[in-house]
Amino acid sequence: MSKAELAVLERRLRPIYDSLDSQQFKKALSDCDKVLKKHPNTSAAKVLKALTLIRLEKLADATEILEALDVPGAHHDELTLQAFVHCYRDSNQHMKVVTLYERIIQVDPSEHNLTQLFMAYSREKMYKEQQKIGMRLYKDFGNAPYYFWSVMSLIMQAQENPELGKKMLLPLADKMCQTQVEKSGYTEGSSAELDLQLLILEGQEKWKECAAFLDRPQASVLPMAPYNLVEKGMDFLMKDKQYKRVDQLAMEAVTKMPDNWNLWKIITESTICQIEQCLESDNKENIELAHNFVKRLGLLIEKVQKQVGYKSRAPFIATFFAYKQIGKLTKQIPDMDDMTSIFGEQVDKMLEYAKNFYKKPVCFADLQMFFCDLTSEQKSNFLKGIDLWIGEVSAKDDVEGDESKVWAIILTERCRRALGEYEKMDAAGHRSLFQQCIAQIAAPERTEHAQGVLCNLTVSHLWDAYRKENDLTKFYEMILLLEFVAASNKTDPMCKLALIRAYSALCATGRISALVKTLDIKVIQMDTLGHLTFPVYETSGRFNLAIIQNTQLSLMYEQAEKEIQDCIAQAYRNGKFSAIPRMTAASKHMKLSAQKTACDVMNRYLSSLFVLDDVDQITVTLWGDEDPIGEKRIDWKQLIDTRDFNAIPYTETEEYEALLDDMKKRTFKELIDISELRSTLCRALGAVGRVTHENMEPRLARLQLKMTVMEFKQHLEYCCREYPSFLIPSKLAQSPAPHHLSQWVHSGGLQMVLEYLEAAVKLVDILDSGEHPEKSLVGTRTEMATKLIKLIEIPPKRKEGEKLPPFWIVDPIIKSSRALQTIAAIQVVLRLIEKVVLKLVKNVPTAVPEPVGKGKGKKDKKAAEEAMTKALDECKAVVFLEHIRAMHVELRSAGNFLHTYLGQMLALEDEYIPSNIGEDLGGAKAALEGMHNPVASRLQRSFLNTCEDMHTTIKLRF
């Protein structure tokens, strides 16, 4: 098609593009029909119509159009091809983009089409195929960059298969690269050839050659800052064990960049490596040489410290790092037990650091890294020194606008807490400290930064009481304090993050939603911070909000993947090859995110139970439309933990790290297990519906049904063993929102669903044998009603005359949500069973049979009615169907019972929000009391909205 014809076509299609861009999909569909009415052979308009149908969620209609047009031998213009690509990407059929361009180059092997095929292969990580296309582009069009695309494809193949890469792929890539450089030289102003050569050398682990390569004049054009170039060169030398050369370069560089912490780490690690080499033998000369290495490091640190004064932190931290690394030596240096003469006394150095850098908020984090290296005596001496110093600072006159004293107090209290002093204090001491912190936070003209750090310190103290003693009153006081700070502090996000974590334990979804909006979390952070809110909407029964949140997360992952792939394509075009492996790794990281998979599975689960009505659509959603025949399965063992637990800082003792590590492992395992449980349940439910699908091979459908039900049963039994009923969620401040898997698997609800799934398996076998099912296959209505009432009756636990504890309402809300999910799941199973019976039973009357003859009198009519009644009674399948339909009545009754129970629960007179707050706090009590009414009102409204949402769901679904 000529440019003029293409311009005419684009002008004709412009209204459709505008409607699609403005998301007016019905108008876009109308515009497509208008164009096709006048120009029925316009392929671009047909494909745009398919794209519109995809966005209107009419995938079947869109697929019909696409399959008719995307056939071998078809010619398509550029606008049509672009529309095809959008269709396939929007419907997650990325491999069809590859097939599309493979067909196109058979009829039109233009440079543009071959380039698009190369990029399509790149998106699907088909590196062998893209290598061939790269070479074809180079041979056909003689453009050197295409040659380098082929070389880069070899490097990517080598990364996928390291063994083959070292033997064949990387040597081949090296030879190809050298041949091209010898033939054409380096491209002026471009780093493409250099990038490739360095990647090849790194892949072959030729560290000496890598270091020499960076010394070449041409290396200056590599896409990295000069100081990064120096650091990378030293990193290569370290790997090649050229420690003397590293020392020479690093010592020269550190005098120019004294605050570059990476240089200090390299110098120290190089020194340690040389010491370890010396200690391999007990030779006196080697031992003396080891002493000299330590002394040389000490002299360098001292020299740079004098050079920079207290303007830079890195030279002073280097002293602590040297102590730490030398202490880690597997074999200690003889005659050097005390290094005070070289580096100075460690505690004195740490006190000196605190006195000179305490105004920097990062000062505590710098010191905390090295507290674990101190002995008990050293810790005690450090605390004594800090107490003396804070006394001196406090004695100084106050200066208006100067917060030096506040930062000194903050550093002191954080150090005391991290070194275990808080654990030695009694309850009165803790309360007094809490009072002082509130006074400092509420002080007039307190800067937002200092206020936020003070609040974080205070929250750590109150969260401890909640974690260790389950003190819900102090937990509520913590929420009040956080709300007090969040109301006035617009810049510090830590308080809002801590509030989200606190409210997630209370299922206070309304306030969580508001806080997430005010935080303005960046899109990519939704992956790492999603754990703060992920299961809350589901556990609290707000299923529509859960679906919205999960949909937003899914869209974020799709958009991130698209942007990464676009960046990779751009990197190929610009010759920035060193960025491609990193971006490919990022893409893989996003694809294997456990959070992403958990969101997708929960969306399928909740949408099928509470949103969709059509049985066929429910079946497809439950099974997963990306897995039509069951070949693709989630590999749960490959999923990656992308959660960021450093979002909420902590000031704790060394033992807390072990608790944190244990929490990370346990909560990640729970996330995987609950997601797999939902997934196996979805697939088992979907497999029941797939038995009735026309396009399913009957034997495969039945095999899948048996296998998926067995998988669900086995995983449910596994979860019951792994998560005993007495297990409680982690109460660490950094832990994710609780999933309550233990409560769910021991509630009895999932076991009920399993019973009906197993009945469905037996039902299919019975029907296949030509027999009709008995009512007993699914149990009686009375049995169902008894189990449902037991599932729903979840009154708060208390002794006679005893008041309920604060926030008692949270547990019944969670149990009600899970009970509602059970009722909905059973409803879906029964609907699917009903469809199976209607599909598989031969000659089942679905309506009342017509009489054979027309009776004239009352006697004849009565006889006809009796005959029909007898015929229906004799048909077991009809009786079974009527029994299934009657069981739906029990489900509706259970829904109404749950509705009534929620109303009664809200009517209980027991207060679920603590009222005795701020005791023994003196004047600081006013700050908490001022927040009590608005916070209590928000919590009550949130709990009420949660119950109302469940009421609405019950009315709509049952």
Swiss-Prot record:
Q: One MF term from GO for this chain?
A: acetyltransferase activator activity
Against InterPro entries, the record matches this protein to: NAA25_NatB_aux_su, TPR-like_helical_dom_sf
Q: Which UniProt keywords apply?
A: Chromosome, Chromosome partition, Cytoplasm, DNA damage, DNA recombination, DNA repair, Meiosis, Nucleus, Repeat, TPR repeat
Protein task: Non-catalytic subunit of the NatB complex which catalyzes acetylation of the N-terminal methionine residues of proteins beginning with Met-Asp or Met-Glu. Required for chromosome organization and arrangement; specifically for assembly of the central region components of the synaptonemal complex onto chromosomes during meiosis and for DNA double stranded break formation and repair. Acts downstream of xnd-1 to regulate levels of histone acetylation in germ and somatic cell nuclei by controlling acetyl-CoA production through antagonizing the acetyl-CoA hydrolase activity of acer-1.
Q: What SUPFAM superfamilies has UniProt attached to this entry?
A: TPR-like (SSF48452)
At which residues are the TPR repeats? 7-42, 78-111, 320-353
The knockout note for this entry states: High embryonic and larval lethality with viable progeny displaying a high incidence of males phenotype. Defective chromosomal morphogenesis, segregation and alignment due to the failure of central region components of the synaptonemal complex to assemble onto chromosomes during meiosis.
Localization terms from the record: Cytoplasm; Nucleus; Chromosome
Q: Report the sequence similarity comment from the record.
A: Belongs to the MDM20/NAA25 family.
Name this protein carries in UniProt: N-terminal acetyltransferase B complex subunit NAA25 homolog
Listed under GO biological process in this entry are: chromosome segregation; cytoskeleton organization; DNA recombination; DNA repair; meiotic cell cycle
**Any one GO cellular component localisation term in the record:** nucleus
Assembly with partners or alone: Component of the N-terminal acetyltransferase B (NatB) complex. Interacts with acer-1.
What superkingdom does the record give?
Eukaryota
Which tissues and organs express this gene's product?
Answer: Expressed in germline and somatic cells.
